[in-house]
Amino acid sequence: MVLHFSNLARHKTFVLHWYRYTLRNVARQTFSWHLKARVKDITRTTIVKHKSDKSSWSIYILLRDLKALNGFLRNKKTAAAWRLLTLYSKKPLRSGASSPSVALEHSPPLQDPETVRNSHIIHSYIVERQQKNLLPLEIPAEYKTLLLLPLALHDHALKRLHLIESKLVRGPPKVSVNYTSAGKARIWFLRTAVNKNQRQSKALGQIIRREKRKNQKNIDYWEKCRVNGIWAWHEAAWEHLMETNTMLTESPAKYFDNERSRKRAASDGTSVKAVAEWLDPVFSSLDMLQAQSAEQAAYFEQYKHNTVLQGLQQFFARKSDKMYQNRKKRFESLLENDLPFVTPYFSQQNLATVMKSHKF
């Protein structure tokens, strides 16, 4: 009999992947904290609400709209994303009503990301000045837009400029050797200003994930061998009881606390021989798993000394120094040629525009 899609593990995994993908997208692609909170809340609520929904058509529409929401977030279409969320946050639609994605075209437009960002900047600027008694509590909206917004953007850009200056004073960025553990193995890599975040090697991420999966399988196999070994010990104890009419006094944990305990007890008589006959295959499997783990650890340790410390570290150190020198030249050019002529109230000559022209 064919299972209903709601009982399939792959369906649950698919929905979970889309949910996590949505959370990553909204964290990276939008500046609005309100929109971030709305996406997280409405997406989670909708998924929980339809957890027991058995209608394949209903689930198809929900997944289609979730895909559309991610497309809006990736393309910075926050207005469309907001409208889609608004339709899902309303009361349930009557029968025969159009789906949320169809009704998007008739919804009013909302503010663009730049306007939302400027609103946050001017709000922080006004609150900070009011706390210092530099601005009145009541300010007309026209004054905020025409008078205070350019000053707020200038102040925001000036803070960024001071941050850039403080980083340049510290000198070229350092090249650090880091590692992540995958069982006994340590996977070594370089962390620099050149290859950070999205510029980090994708192959490195694939290697780390692959090794962690392999290590988890190794742990799972080890646990299975331990469980099978305990059952094997009980079989050996029964065999010993049938042959000698005596019970074994030790516990099965003795043989798994120390992997060589069976060798030390090899001359103790038939009881140890019976235990050895049952446990030797298990110990062979454990030895093989340990050898694989040690081999991987030795490989990555050798890779660290032969590759990471020998060639890659010097290569990235040179690239980091070159990047620092280019950044320093651009900063000095900004200070000498453009900074003296900065004016907050001219869009082509304000500090943010000047910094952008120098790639800051």
From Swiss-Prot:
It comes from the Eukaryota. GO terms for cellular component: mitochondrion. Residues 93-112 are annotated as: Disordered. Keywords: Mitochondrion. The keyword Mitochondrion applies. It is found in: Mitochondrion. Signal peptide: none annotated. This is Required for respiratory growth protein 1, mitochondrial. It comes from Lachancea thermotolerans (strain ATCC 56472 / CBS 6340 / NRRL Y-8284) (Yeast).
